[in-house]
Amino acid sequence: MNYLSNITTSQRPWLLLALAALGLELSALYFQYVLGLAPCIMCVYQRLAILAIFSAGAIGAIGHQNIVARILAYVLWGVGAIWGLIIALEHVEMQKNSGSLFFSCEFIPNFPTWAPLHEWIPFLFEATGDCGEISWRFFNYSMPQWMVVVYALFSIVFSIVLINRLVCAKKP
């Protein structure tokens, strides 16, 4: 119990989080530029969520001794993991209902006007694919289904670490 509570005050777990997210970002770029799979708008949003998790890991690794840095890292990790899970679940639902008349997939990301990431970093955030298209499977799971697993794991680990940290911090 105490180990989990103190895990975020050391650098290694934060580096592991950053490396896991970096691996996922690099995998996304591999799928896009080597295998030729065009990312859809939901893929772009999921990339942004992974980028938030990567940022959490990097900030936590650099500032693991600083409470403000750790709080910022927790916030980015939680937001990235939970928002990513929600987006991935929506993406799976879109793929399930892609033949429906009510199915719609935007082509321009809904980023704030002050941060048009798809214009600033198009190689990473430009959506050129169709959300309903399933062009890749692994063990009969589509990419969004695998991302549900990934984000669920990130969310579960986040919840366990955060709850443990809060419970142990309250003990005298």
Swiss-Prot record:
Residues 31-48, 90-145 are periplasmic. Its main location: membrane. The chain crosses the membrane at residues 14-30, 49-64, 72-89, 146-164. Disulfide bonds join 40-43, 105-131. Pfam families: DsbB. It is a multi-pass membrane protein. One of its GO terms (biological process) is protein folding. One of its GO terms (molecular function) is protein-disulfide reductase activity. It is found in: Cell inner membrane. Keywords: Cell inner membrane, Cell membrane, Chaperone, Disulfide bond, Electron transport, Membrane, Oxidoreductase, Redox-active center, Transmembrane, Transmembrane helix, Transport. NCBIfam families: PRK01749.1. Required for disulfide bond formation in some periplasmic proteins. Acts by oxidizing the DsbA protein. This is Disulfide bond formation protein B. It comes from Colwellia psychrerythraea (strain 34H / ATCC BAA-681) (Vibrio psychroerythus). The gene is dsbB.
